[in-house]
C-alpha cells in the first residue's frame, strides 16, 4: 500500500502568541507512524515579512529535521506590490512553491483587507 500525503500541516506555526506543538521532527515522525510519507506545510509570513524571508525561515526549520518527504504551501498574510512581485519569484524552480493561501478570517492577524 502506498503512503499517504498530508496536504495541510502546521509545524512550528506561530499563532496569536503561541505556536503549534509539533515541530518538523516530531510531526513527520508521527506522520510516518501513521502511514503518511509526505507532508505539505504552510509557510506563514509575519506581517511585513517578505515571502522569501518566510520561505527561508521555514526551510531552516525543516531541512535536516524531517523524517519524510515534505513540500511547502505559501500563505499571503499582507498585500502590496512587493508581495505581488515575490509571488512570481517564489513559483520558480529555485523555490518550488506552487500554491498560495489567502485568509478571509483572522481579522488584524492574517486576513487580507
What is the meaning of each model-derived region?
Residues 1-65:
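Metal-associated gating/positioning segment near the N- to mid-region
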Amino acid at each position: 500500500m502506498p503512503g499517504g500525503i498530508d496536504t495541510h500541516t502546521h509545524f512550528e506555526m506561530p499563532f496569536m502568541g503561541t505556536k503549534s506543538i509539533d515541530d518538523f521532527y516530531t510531526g513527520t515522525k508521527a506522520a510516518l507512524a501513521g502511514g503518511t510519507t509526505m507532508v505539505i506545510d504552510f509557510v506563514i509570513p509575519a506581517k511585513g515579512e517578505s515571502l522569501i524571508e518566510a520561505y527561508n525561515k521555514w526551510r531552516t526549520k525543516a531541512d535536516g529535521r524531517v523524517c519524510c518527504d515534505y513540500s511547502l504551501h505559501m500563505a499571503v498574510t499582507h498585500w502590496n506590490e512587493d508581495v505581488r512581485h515575490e509571488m512570481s519569484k517564489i513559483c520558480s524552480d529555485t523555490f518550488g512553491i506552487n500554491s498560495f493561501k489567502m485568509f478571509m478570517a483572522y481579522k488584524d492577524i492574517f486576513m487580507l483587507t
